[in-house]
A protein has these predicted regions:
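Helix N-cap at the start of a conserved alpha-helix in ABC-type nucleotide-binding domains
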Residues: 108-110
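Single conserved hydrophobic/aromatic residue that forms the stacking wall/gate
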Residues: 1-10
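ABC ATPase NBD coupling module
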Residues: 11-25
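ABC-family P-loop ATPase nucleotide-binding domains
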Residues: 28-84
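Catalytic Walker B motif of ABC-type/P-loop ATPase nucleotide-binding domains
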Residues: 97-101
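ABC ATPase nucleotide-binding domain "signature" loop
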Residues: 104-106
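ABC transporter nucleotide-binding domain
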Residues: 113-194
Length: 194
């Protein structure tokens, strides 16, 4: 596997640019934690990377989420690891929070709690979360703009309310001999023949 690409923020390369990195936090689908590390160890680690890391808030949220600060993260459930990753991201104090399938592995109550955290930071400190998800309904109550990626490119980028009114999923079986060329004027994302 050979991946080629770059990431620019404010027209600056992110790679090895500490000022730009300090403004962005990434929560992957499978969060990484220090080997044998605890939540406390992760807090100390991220305090060294993110100058605006709010340790007091992290400690308070850790208690609210009932996550033990001295327990090894490797013993946490998948949902607990996701919660910890979100708390670290929120408390990093960055302008941007990049999230990959952040709500996967969280129970419904915890999903709402995490959404409330995001909404609070959007309102209080103008946080911009960028959330990748296969579940658009999951994001309706916290997102106002949606971009759809398809085959490595941006298929569309729209205000969520506009998108709800103008985009429809239609699945149909066409008679033999009818192909996509017969459907001119319709923006087709995917066709499948059997």
């Amino acid at each position: 596997l050979h991946i080629v690409g770059s990431s620019d923020v404010y027209k600056r390369q992110v790679f090895e640019n500490t000022k730009v990195k300090a403004r962005c936090f990434y929560i992957p689908d499978e969060p990484y934690f220090l080997s044998n590390g605890t939540a406390e160890d992760m807090k100390v680690f991220y305090q060294g990377i993110y100058p605006k890391f709010d340790a007091a808030r992290f400690d308070k949220l850790l208690k609210n989420f009932e996550l033990e600060s001295r327990r090894k993260v490797q013993t946490f459930s998948k949902g607990m690891k996701k919660q910890l990753a979100v708390l670290l991201g929120i408390c990093a104090g960055t302008d941007y929070l990049f999230c990959d399938e952040t709500f996967d592995g969280l129970d419904p109550v915890m999903r709402q709690t995490v959404k409330s955290l995001f909404a609070n930071d959007i309102e209080e400190r103008n946080l911009t979360p960028v959330i990748a998800s296969h579940n658009l309904r999951e994001l309706e109550d916290i997102c106002d703009h949606v971009g759809l990626l398809h085959k490595g490119g941006m298929l569309l980028s729209k205000d969520l309310d506009d998108m709800k009114l103008n985009i429809h999923k239609i699945q149909c079986v066409l008679p033999a001999g009818v192909g996509s060329s017969d459907l001119q004027g319709i923006d087709i994302i995917k066709t499948e023949q059997r």
